[in-house]
């Protein structure tokens, strides 16, 4: 019986290998430029599209795969990508694209509904792709590969997807952004990226540029049109009431020392109250900052586990309330909603026109913040 099972497994593996071999031809890859990231800039009456592509070498090119930056112009992103295909002699494939970046002049001056529609309606483009905007041009951003010594697209995606929750920065993907521009208040946000040059410490390559990305701010949009920027200080308040975002830090005076307290987990509730206003209830679970994030233990563990005094907890609560209130006032000032205030009304009244048209300025908000020790 065991022998029959082994034979069956071998035959099954062989059949699967044949099916894959038939449906996946080497020429399919050789004829394609696989796009890792796209950048879109305004260039007069046209768009300048920058792509970081991963393409197998052929002809006189180096054997193997490599990443390079390619640019093309067009009236639309679709046209620019077609031009890109003509320039490279290979089909431009968006199926593996993980990042889209809008340059400053493009996202602040132009309605980019056509670009969003093109990407979201594409069968091959991933709805989970990260989408963001940047200060300066997207073309310049993608040309920072040398300074980073690695792929710009993969570096940014890793930051936005993996690190964002650890450093209290909300992040967005294509599907979420598309929905935010069509539902309720039709407002949403994109992470704002900026490149910061740093001093070169490499003695062997003193002329090589070096730097890093900062992504501590967001830009707000309504129906794919720019509304305002939310700076790093205001983004702290936004992060405190954004679900699945942790890592906010607070500096508190504790006796004769400054203590850093970090948010490890939280619970956020947004609901209507009896006065038909919105109550935002935030429960933060905090602990003193540790030298490591995996909590594997060590000689300092017993000291780090000591309880946080109530005075420090009260200080954290006060700081958190101030940061959230500051952000909420800014929301009302520019009349946008990226913290689900309108969603609270929809749960009770449905998607009625008055719910969607309700001004954020007219929504009374009650904030409740509770801080617990881990």
Model-flagged regions — what are they?
Residues 2-374:
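Membrane-proximal alpha-helical signals and transmembrane carboxylates
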């Amino acid at each position: 019986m065991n022998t029959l099972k082994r034979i069956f497994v071998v035959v099954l593996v062989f059949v699967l290998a044949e099916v894959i071999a038939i449906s996946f031809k080497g020429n399919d890859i050789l004829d394609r430029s696989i796009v890792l990231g796209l950048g879109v800039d305004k260039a007069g009456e046209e768009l300048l599209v920058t792509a970081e592509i991963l393409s197998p070498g052929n002809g006189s090119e180096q054997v193997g795969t490599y990443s390079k930056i390619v640019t093309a112009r067009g009236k639309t992103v679709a046209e620019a990508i077609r031009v890109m295909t003509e320039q490279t002699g290979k089909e431009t494939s968006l199926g593996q694209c993980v990042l889209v970046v809008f340059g400053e002049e493009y996202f602040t001056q132009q309605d980019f509904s056509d670009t969003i529609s093109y990407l979201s309606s594409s069968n091959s483009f991933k709805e989970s792709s990260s989408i963001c905007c940047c200060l300066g041009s997207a073309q310049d951003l993608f040309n920072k590969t040398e300074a980073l010594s690695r792929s710009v697209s993969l570096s940014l995606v890793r930051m936005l997807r993996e690190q964002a929750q650890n450093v209290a920065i909300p992040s967005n993907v294509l599907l979420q952004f598309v929905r935010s521009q069509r539902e309720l208040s039709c407002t949403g946000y994109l992470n704002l990226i900026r490149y910061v040059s740093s001093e070169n410490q490499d003695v062997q390559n003193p002329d090589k540029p070096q730097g890093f990305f900062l992504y501590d701010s967001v830009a707000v949009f309504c129906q794919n049109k720019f509304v305002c920027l939310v700076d790093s200080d205001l983004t702290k308040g936004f992060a405190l009431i954004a679900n699945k975002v942790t890592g906010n830090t607070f500096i508190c005076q504790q006796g004769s020392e400054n203590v850093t307290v970090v948010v490890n987990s939280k619970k956020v509730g947004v609901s209507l109250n009896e006065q038909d206003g919105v109550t935002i209830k935030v429960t933060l679970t905090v602990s003193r900052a540790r030298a490591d994030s995996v909590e594997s233990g060590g000689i300092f563990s017993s000291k780090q586990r000591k309880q946080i005094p109530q005075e420090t907890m009260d200080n954290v609560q006060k700081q958190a309330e101030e940061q959230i209130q500051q952000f909420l006032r800014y929301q009302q000032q520019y009349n946008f909603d990226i913290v689900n205030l309108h969603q609270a009304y929809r749960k009770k009244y449905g998607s009625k026109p008055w719910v969607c048209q309700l001004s954020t300025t007219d929504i009374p908000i009650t904030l409740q913040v509770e801080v617990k020790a881990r």
